[in-house]
Amino acid sequence: LVAIDKTLFLETESETGETVGYGVPIAAYPSEAGKVIVNSPGSGELKDGREDRWRNLGLYLQKRGLASLVTFNAPRPDFQVQLEWEPYSYQGASWNKILIESLSHTIDWSLENAKELCGNASPDIYLTGFSSGGSSVGAVAHRYPSVKRILLLSTYDSVGDPFYEGVTAFTGDIYLVYGDQDPMAGYLARILRTGKFAAKSFLVREAPECGHRFDGEANTKLLTQAFHWAFEGDNSQPLNPGN
């Protein structure tokens, strides 16, 4: 099995009503696992991830027949226009909006091509997102009945109200992992724990000796463990960089 590389060509509107075209590169790692994981990287990452971590994870899941990973990236912010209400923009359009739309179109593409991706035309879809990518996952997961679980990694509420509105409306299982050296993500985890959710379950793990970016070999292993924990239902083992 090999990776599938694809670029979606999309359009959105700038804040002044002009049409903005943009491309969303996708990498997919097909398997016969019968389930698809759509990954939304952080704002500073391309689809393959920092040090190719999402590419390596896609190959890992593919080789073991565990799941078919689909990963993408929205266009990088270009700072041509400074919007009043958010720090990032792309050709005058809200970057948060573009990120959410990019994820939605990637999910749509994954559903349309599910048979080729995982051997199942109507699979369960799992979503995962890192940092701002996790914020976009929280915003859109509730729109898709086939999305059963989401994994939020080092997640901030960067897309704003759509994140809170979406994550509280999602009816599947929510898994959240953050590093013990990432106070902002830890603060959001505490806020979410006190909120009212439609979710079937809400489980939180704190990764030891870990910062926001999950840098280093040990923390990369923690990311892999987090995927096993969330998407294989193994809730028995703590996240441990020594495993």
Which role fits each region the language model picked out?
Residues 1-27:
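A domain-start/cap signature at the N-terminus of enzymes
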